[in-house]
Amino acid sequence: MASQLRVYVPEHPLIKHWLGVARDENTPPVLFKTAMGELGRWLTYEAARYWLPTVDTEVKTPLAIAKASLIDPQTPFVIVPILRAGLALVEGAQGLLPLAKIYHLGLVRNETTLEPSLYLNKLPERFAPGTHLLLLDPMLATGNTIMAALDLLMARDIDANLIRLVSVVAAPTALQKLSNAHPNLTIYTAMIDEQLNDRGYIVPGLGDAGDRCFGT
């Protein structure tokens, strides 16, 4: 059976709330950044539900021995935010995966061609076998940036089945590209918006998430 891209839009009231705050053009940068951090937290929570491997063990309570299920300490976890806007999602995600290593990836989009160029690559030469990777990109618009990021990850022996992509807003254009190129991928997003404008921005979207986070 052929693989098929899995896209989840969690029906969580806190995700809906913080998305509404982030969408509002009157939200000041400090609150916008807070909203993005909360979206990073709750979308990571949803993404981790069937993704975190556990081991069965026993612990001693003050009264007796109890069975317990703990996150497998042998599994390597990695968070990769795509700069700049991906930084806003890191705090929330890292709060749930405190032992994860964080590797930064900087990609900037040419506003004329809409093609990305790489300006920062802190990825390792290779990822350890079995690495679980959380990829953070707030806006999946044309799909060009996320495709470039995935090319860099795949060249370093990451297993697409072990990637969870967290995005705040996604457009059908990007999802179609990802479906064609990486059907094993799993995506968690707060919303799938209808379309892109002639500048490649998602509509209604959030505007420029990086600019809004940092007040520039």
From Swiss-Prot:
Name of the protein described by the UniProt record: Uracil phosphoribosyltransferase
The UniProt gene name for this protein comes to upp
Known regulation of activity: Allosterically activated by GTP.
A Gene Ontology biological process annotation? Answer: uracil salvage
Q: Which domain of life is it from?
A: Bacteria
Keyword DNA repair belongs to the record? no
- Please give the family membership noted in the entry: Belongs to the UPRTase family.
User: Pathway involvement?
Assistant: Pyrimidine metabolism; UMP biosynthesis via salvage pathway; UMP from uracil: step 1/1
Check the record and name the HAMAP family matching this protein.
Upp_B
Matching InterPro entries: PRibTrfase_dom (IPR000836), PRTase-like (IPR029057), Upp_B (IPR034332), UPRTase/APRTase (IPR050054), Ura_phspho_trans (IPR005765)
State how the cofactor is bound.
Binds 1 Mg(2+) ion per subunit. The magnesium is bound as Mg-PRPP.
Q: Which GO terms describe its cellular component?
A: cytoplasm
Q: What does this protein do?
A: Catalyzes the conversion of uracil and 5-phospho-alpha-D-ribose 1-diphosphate (PRPP) to UMP and diphosphate.
Annotated EC: 2.4.2.9
Question: Which keywords does this Swiss-Prot/TrEMBL entry list?
Answer: Allosteric enzyme, Glycosyltransferase, GTP-binding, Magnesium, Nucleotide-binding, Transferase
**Organism from which the protein derives:** Synechocystis sp. (strain ATCC 27184 / PCC 6803 / Kazusa)
Cofactor(s) recorded for this entry are: Mg(2+)
**Residues annotated for uracil binding in this entry:** I202, G207, D208, A209
Q: Where does 5-phospho-alpha-D-ribose 1-diphosphate bind?
A: R84, R109, D137, P138, M139, L140, A141, T142, G143, N144, T145, D208
